[in-house]
Protein backbone atom coordinates (compact mmCIF):
# COMPACT_ATOMS: atom_id res chain seq x y z
CA UNK A 1 0.00 0.00 0.00
CA UNK A 2 2.89 2.39 0.66
CA UNK A 3 4.40 2.06 -2.85
CA UNK A 4 1.27 3.02 -4.83
CA UNK A 5 0.62 5.93 -2.53
CA UNK A 6 4.18 7.18 -3.05
CA UNK A 7 3.90 7.00 -6.86
CA UNK A 8 0.63 8.93 -6.82
CA UNK A 9 2.13 11.66 -4.67
CA UNK A 10 5.18 11.93 -7.02
CA UNK A 11 2.94 12.31 -10.06
CA UNK A 12 0.99 15.16 -8.45
CA UNK A 13 4.22 17.01 -7.59
CA UNK A 14 5.55 16.74 -11.18
CA UNK A 15 2.22 17.88 -12.65
CA UNK A 16 2.17 20.93 -10.42
CA UNK A 17 5.77 21.81 -11.35
CA UNK A 18 5.05 21.58 -15.09
CA UNK A 19 1.95 23.73 -14.75
CA UNK A 20 3.87 26.39 -12.91
CA UNK A 21 6.59 26.60 -15.61
CA UNK A 22 4.12 27.17 -18.48
CA UNK A 23 3.50 30.89 -17.77
CA UNK A 24 7.26 31.55 -17.63
CA UNK A 25 7.90 29.82 -20.97
CA UNK A 26 5.00 31.65 -22.61
CA UNK A 27 6.26 34.97 -21.23
CA UNK A 28 9.73 34.26 -22.60
CA UNK A 29 8.38 33.52 -26.08
CA UNK A 30 6.29 36.71 -26.06
CA UNK A 31 9.38 38.74 -25.26
CA UNK A 32 11.25 37.20 -28.19
CA UNK A 33 8.37 37.97 -30.57
CA UNK A 34 8.36 41.54 -29.35
CA UNK A 35 11.97 41.96 -30.36
CA UNK A 36 11.24 41.19 -34.05
CA UNK A 37 13.08 38.50 -35.95
CA UNK A 38 16.20 38.43 -33.76
CA UNK A 39 15.30 35.01 -32.30
CA UNK A 40 14.26 31.80 -34.03
CA UNK A 41 12.88 28.76 -32.27
CA UNK A 42 14.30 25.51 -33.65
CA UNK A 43 12.83 22.58 -31.78
CA UNK A 44 14.31 22.66 -28.28
CA UNK A 45 16.81 25.39 -29.28
CA UNK A 46 16.24 29.11 -29.18
CA UNK A 47 18.43 30.62 -31.92
CA UNK A 48 19.48 34.25 -31.51
CA UNK A 49 22.40 36.54 -32.31
CA UNK A 50 23.91 35.96 -28.85
CA UNK A 51 23.96 32.17 -28.87
CA UNK A 52 24.30 31.31 -32.60
CA UNK A 53 27.68 29.62 -32.14
CA UNK A 54 26.46 27.71 -29.08
CA UNK A 55 23.41 26.20 -30.75
CA UNK A 56 25.11 25.22 -34.06
CA UNK A 57 28.69 24.02 -34.07
CA UNK A 58 30.29 25.67 -37.13
CA UNK A 59 33.65 24.00 -36.65
CA UNK A 60 32.40 20.96 -38.56
CA UNK A 61 30.90 22.90 -41.50
CA UNK A 62 31.70 20.22 -44.05
CA UNK A 63 30.04 17.65 -41.86
CA UNK A 64 26.92 19.75 -41.65
CA UNK A 65 26.69 19.90 -45.48
CA UNK A 66 27.44 16.22 -46.00
CA UNK A 67 24.17 14.50 -46.84
CA UNK A 68 25.75 11.08 -46.95
CA UNK A 69 23.51 8.42 -48.37
CA UNK A 70 20.32 10.34 -47.81
CA UNK A 71 19.96 11.32 -51.50
CA UNK A 72 18.58 8.60 -53.76
CA UNK A 73 20.88 7.40 -56.54
CA UNK A 74 19.76 8.48 -60.02
CA UNK A 75 19.58 5.67 -62.55
CA UNK A 76 19.69 6.24 -66.32
CA UNK A 77 17.36 3.95 -68.23
CA UNK A 78 15.86 3.89 -71.71
CA UNK A 79 12.31 5.08 -72.09
CA UNK A 80 9.93 2.47 -73.29
CA UNK A 81 8.10 3.23 -76.56
CA UNK A 82 4.54 4.54 -76.20
CA UNK A 83 1.82 1.99 -75.90
CA UNK A 84 0.59 0.80 -79.27
CA UNK A 85 3.84 1.53 -81.17
CA UNK A 86 6.04 -1.41 -81.93
CA UNK A 87 9.82 -1.28 -81.84
CA UNK A 88 9.92 -1.64 -85.61
CA UNK A 89 7.71 1.43 -86.03
CA UNK A 90 9.74 3.51 -83.57
CA UNK A 91 12.96 2.94 -85.54
CA UNK A 92 13.33 5.59 -88.29
CA UNK A 93 15.28 4.81 -91.43
CA UNK A 94 17.45 7.79 -92.55
CA UNK A 95 16.74 9.10 -96.06
CA UNK A 96 19.55 8.59 -98.54
CA UNK A 97 20.61 11.91 -100.10
CA UNK A 98 21.55 12.00 -103.75
CA UNK A 99 25.06 13.29 -104.38
CA UNK A 100 24.27 14.19 -107.99
CA UNK A 101 23.72 17.97 -108.31
CA UNK A 102 20.53 19.22 -109.91
CA UNK A 103 21.00 21.87 -112.58
CA UNK A 104 18.36 24.61 -112.60
CA UNK A 105 18.28 26.72 -115.71
CA UNK A 106 16.71 30.20 -115.62
CA UNK A 107 13.68 30.64 -117.82
CA UNK A 108 14.08 34.39 -118.22
CA UNK A 109 16.93 36.87 -118.53
CA UNK A 110 17.49 38.28 -115.06
CA UNK A 111 18.39 41.81 -114.07
CA UNK A 112 22.05 40.78 -113.96
CA UNK A 113 22.07 39.64 -117.56
CA UNK A 114 22.61 36.16 -118.96
CA UNK A 115 25.80 34.21 -118.19
CA UNK A 116 28.87 35.09 -120.26
CA UNK A 117 31.91 33.03 -121.20
CA UNK A 118 33.02 33.01 -117.55
CA UNK A 119 29.75 31.33 -116.55
CA UNK A 120 28.62 34.33 -114.52
CA UNK A 121 26.01 37.01 -115.25
CA UNK A 122 27.43 40.08 -116.98
CA UNK A 123 26.66 42.40 -114.08
CA UNK A 124 28.79 40.26 -111.77
CA UNK A 125 31.80 40.48 -114.11
CA UNK A 126 31.11 44.11 -115.09
CA UNK A 127 29.65 47.03 -113.17
CA UNK A 128 26.06 47.93 -114.04
CA UNK A 129 24.92 51.38 -112.93
CA UNK A 130 21.49 52.25 -114.20
CA UNK A 131 21.63 51.94 -117.98
CA UNK A 132 25.45 52.04 -118.11
CA UNK A 133 27.63 48.91 -118.20
CA UNK A 134 31.34 49.20 -117.31
CA UNK A 135 33.48 46.22 -118.38
CA UNK A 136 36.88 47.93 -118.39
CA UNK A 137 39.92 45.70 -117.85
CA UNK A 138 37.79 42.58 -117.25
CA UNK A 139 39.91 40.20 -119.37
CA UNK A 140 37.08 39.80 -121.88
CA UNK A 141 37.62 38.12 -125.24
CA UNK A 142 34.11 38.77 -126.57
CA UNK A 143 31.31 41.26 -126.08
CA UNK A 144 29.35 39.94 -123.07
CA UNK A 145 25.55 39.55 -123.13
CA UNK A 146 24.09 42.92 -122.15
CA UNK A 147 20.83 43.92 -120.45
CA UNK A 148 18.20 45.11 -122.91
CA UNK A 149 18.14 48.54 -121.28
CA UNK A 150 21.86 49.22 -121.84
CA UNK A 151 22.48 52.76 -123.10
CA UNK A 152 26.23 53.17 -122.54
CA UNK A 153 28.82 50.40 -122.85
CA UNK A 154 32.45 50.76 -121.76
CA UNK A 155 34.61 47.69 -122.44
CA UNK A 156 38.08 49.20 -122.65
CA UNK A 157 41.43 47.48 -122.02
CA UNK A 158 40.30 43.94 -122.82
CA UNK A 159 41.29 41.27 -125.37
CA UNK A 160 38.30 41.46 -127.70
CA UNK A 161 39.26 40.53 -131.28
CA UNK A 162 35.98 40.51 -133.14
CA UNK A 163 32.57 42.13 -132.98
CA UNK A 164 29.94 39.69 -134.20
CA UNK A 165 26.61 40.44 -135.83
CA UNK A 166 24.58 39.34 -132.81
CA UNK A 167 26.62 41.01 -130.08
CA UNK A 168 24.33 44.05 -129.88
CA UNK A 169 21.13 42.50 -131.18
CA UNK A 170 17.99 44.01 -129.69
CA UNK A 171 19.80 46.85 -127.91
CA UNK A 172 17.61 49.59 -129.34
CA UNK A 173 18.59 52.11 -126.63
CA UNK A 174 22.36 51.78 -127.02
CA UNK A 175 23.85 55.26 -127.61
CA UNK A 176 27.56 54.89 -126.89
CA UNK A 177 30.05 52.06 -127.43
CA UNK A 178 33.61 52.51 -126.16
CA UNK A 179 35.95 49.63 -127.03
CA UNK A 180 39.26 51.47 -126.71
CA UNK A 181 42.48 49.49 -126.32
CA UNK A 182 41.39 46.05 -127.43
CA UNK A 183 42.62 43.85 -130.28
CA UNK A 184 39.63 44.23 -132.61
CA UNK A 185 40.55 43.39 -136.19
CA UNK A 186 37.11 42.75 -137.72
CA UNK A 187 33.53 43.95 -137.28
CA UNK A 188 30.63 42.17 -138.97
CA UNK A 189 28.58 44.40 -141.27
CA UNK A 190 25.35 43.98 -139.32
CA UNK A 191 26.95 44.34 -135.89
CA UNK A 192 26.46 48.13 -135.73
CA UNK A 193 24.39 49.13 -138.74
CA UNK A 194 21.08 48.09 -137.16
CA UNK A 195 21.50 50.08 -133.93
CA UNK A 196 18.99 52.94 -134.34
CA UNK A 197 20.11 55.02 -131.33
CA UNK A 198 23.91 54.68 -131.65
CA UNK A 199 25.59 58.11 -131.59
CA UNK A 200 29.15 57.58 -130.35
CA UNK A 201 31.46 54.82 -131.59
CA UNK A 202 34.86 54.90 -129.85
CA UNK A 203 37.41 52.42 -131.27
CA UNK A 204 40.94 53.81 -130.81
CA UNK A 205 43.98 51.57 -130.29
CA UNK A 206 42.72 48.47 -132.07
CA UNK A 207 43.76 46.65 -135.24
CA UNK A 208 41.03 47.65 -137.69
CA UNK A 209 41.97 47.80 -141.36
CA UNK A 210 38.48 48.81 -142.55
CA UNK A 211 35.46 50.68 -141.23
CA UNK A 212 32.21 48.73 -140.82
CA UNK A 213 28.78 49.80 -142.02
CA UNK A 214 27.49 52.43 -139.59
CA UNK A 215 23.99 53.56 -138.56
CA UNK A 216 22.78 56.96 -139.86
CA UNK A 217 22.42 58.43 -136.34
CA UNK A 218 26.17 58.29 -135.63
CA UNK A 219 27.65 61.62 -134.49
CA UNK A 220 31.13 60.72 -133.21
CA UNK A 221 33.46 58.20 -134.86
CA UNK A 222 36.84 57.74 -133.21
CA UNK A 223 39.14 55.18 -134.86
CA UNK A 224 42.56 56.59 -134.02
CA UNK A 225 45.62 54.35 -133.72
CA UNK A 226 44.37 51.52 -135.91
CA UNK A 227 45.56 50.12 -139.25
CA UNK A 228 42.94 51.77 -141.44
CA UNK A 229 43.70 52.00 -145.14
CA UNK A 230 41.96 54.19 -147.69
CA UNK A 231 40.67 51.07 -149.43
CA UNK A 232 38.97 50.08 -146.20
CA UNK A 233 36.53 53.03 -146.35
CA UNK A 234 33.71 52.43 -148.80
CA UNK A 235 32.85 55.23 -151.28
CA UNK A 236 29.87 57.33 -150.17
CA UNK A 237 29.98 55.61 -146.76
CA UNK A 238 30.70 58.85 -144.91
CA UNK A 239 28.32 61.03 -146.94
CA UNK A 240 25.41 58.87 -145.80
CA UNK A 241 26.12 59.75 -142.16
CA UNK A 242 24.07 62.94 -142.17
CA UNK A 243 24.54 63.57 -138.43
CA UNK A 244 28.29 62.90 -138.24
CA UNK A 245 30.09 65.83 -136.55
CA UNK A 246 33.42 64.47 -135.29
CA UNK A 247 35.61 62.14 -137.35
CA UNK A 248 38.93 61.12 -135.77
CA UNK A 249 41.15 58.93 -137.99
CA UNK A 250 44.63 60.00 -136.89
CA UNK A 251 47.57 57.59 -136.67
CA UNK A 252 46.46 55.14 -139.35
CA UNK A 253 47.66 54.11 -142.83
CA UNK A 254 45.47 56.40 -144.97
CA UNK A 255 47.05 57.71 -148.17
CA UNK A 256 44.20 60.06 -149.17
CA UNK A 257 41.52 62.21 -147.58
CA UNK A 258 38.37 60.12 -147.22
CA UNK A 259 35.24 61.49 -148.79
CA UNK A 260 32.89 62.77 -149.80
CA UNK A 261 32.37 64.24 -146.35
CA UNK A 262 28.90 64.95 -144.91
CA UNK A 263 27.83 68.63 -144.59
CA UNK A 264 27.28 68.17 -140.84
CA UNK A 265 31.00 67.57 -140.12
CA UNK A 266 32.66 69.95 -137.62
CA UNK A 267 36.02 68.32 -136.89
CA UNK A 268 38.29 66.13 -139.05
CA UNK A 269 41.53 64.73 -137.61
CA UNK A 270 43.84 62.97 -140.09
CA UNK A 271 47.27 63.67 -138.61
CA UNK A 272 50.10 61.13 -138.75
CA UNK A 273 48.91 59.23 -141.81
CA UNK A 274 50.46 58.69 -145.26
CA UNK A 275 48.55 61.39 -147.16
CA UNK A 276 50.62 62.95 -149.98
CA UNK A 277 47.95 64.58 -152.13
CA UNK A 278 44.30 65.63 -152.14
CA UNK A 279 41.50 66.10 -154.63
CA UNK A 280 40.33 69.62 -155.38
CA UNK A 281 36.87 68.67 -154.20
CA UNK A 282 38.03 67.04 -150.98
CA UNK A 283 36.37 69.81 -148.95
CA UNK A 284 34.68 72.16 -151.40
CA UNK A 285 32.60 71.75 -154.54
CA UNK A 286 34.51 73.57 -157.31
CA UNK A 287 31.25 74.20 -159.19
CA UNK A 288 29.55 75.85 -156.21
CA UNK A 289 31.68 78.88 -155.45
CA UNK A 290 29.06 80.30 -153.12
CA UNK A 291 28.95 77.10 -151.11
CA UNK A 292 30.46 77.36 -147.64
CA UNK A 293 31.29 74.73 -145.03
CA UNK A 294 30.90 77.10 -142.14
CA UNK A 295 30.71 74.25 -139.62
CA UNK A 296 33.99 72.58 -140.58
CA UNK A 297 36.46 74.65 -138.55
CA UNK A 298 38.89 71.98 -137.32
CA UNK A 299 40.96 70.09 -139.92
CA UNK A 300 44.22 68.43 -138.83
CA UNK A 301 46.66 67.21 -141.50
CA UNK A 302 49.93 67.68 -139.63
CA UNK A 303 52.26 64.74 -139.58
CA UNK A 304 51.51 63.85 -143.23
CA UNK A 305 53.94 64.23 -146.18
CA UNK A 306 51.46 66.46 -148.06
CA UNK A 307 52.32 70.08 -148.85
CA UNK A 308 49.14 72.08 -148.26
CA UNK A 309 50.51 75.03 -150.26
CA UNK A 310 50.13 73.08 -153.48
CA UNK A 311 46.32 72.99 -153.26
CA UNK A 312 45.08 76.55 -152.62
CA UNK A 313 41.78 76.07 -154.45
CA UNK A 314 40.79 73.24 -152.17
CA UNK A 315 40.06 75.49 -149.17
CA UNK A 316 37.97 78.39 -150.48
CA UNK A 317 34.77 77.18 -148.79
CA UNK A 318 36.35 76.65 -145.38
CA UNK A 319 36.15 79.18 -142.52
CA UNK A 320 39.70 78.18 -141.47
CA UNK A 321 42.68 76.66 -143.26
CA UNK A 322 43.74 73.13 -142.35
CA UNK A 323 46.64 72.59 -139.98
CA UNK A 324 49.67 70.97 -141.61
CA UNK A 325 52.89 71.37 -143.57
CA UNK A 326 52.87 74.27 -145.97
CA UNK A 327 55.36 75.54 -148.60
From Swiss-Prot:
Q: Would you name any one GO CC term?
A: extracellular matrix
Ranges in coiled-coil conformation: none
Where Sulfotyrosine occurs, residue numbers?
61, 67
PTM: O-glycosylated.
Q: Main subcellular localization, coarse class? A: secreted
Return the annotated site residues (Cleavage).
20-21, 110-111
Tissue specificity statement from the Swiss-Prot or TrEMBL entry: Ocular tissues, cartilage, ligament, skin, muscle and testes.
Q: Where is the LRRNT domain?
A: 111-148
> By its UniProt entry, which SMART domains does this protein fall under?
LRR_TYP, LRRNT
Q: Where in the cell is it found?
A: Secreted, Extracellular space, Extracellular matrix
Subunit text: Homodimer.
| Role description | Inhibits angiogenesis in the vitreous humor of the eye, and therefore represses neovascularization. Binds collagen fibrils. May be involved in collagen fiber organization via regulation of other members of the small leucine-rich repeat proteoglycan superfamily.
What's the protein name? Opticin
Instruction: Give the originating organism.
Output: Canis lupus familiaris
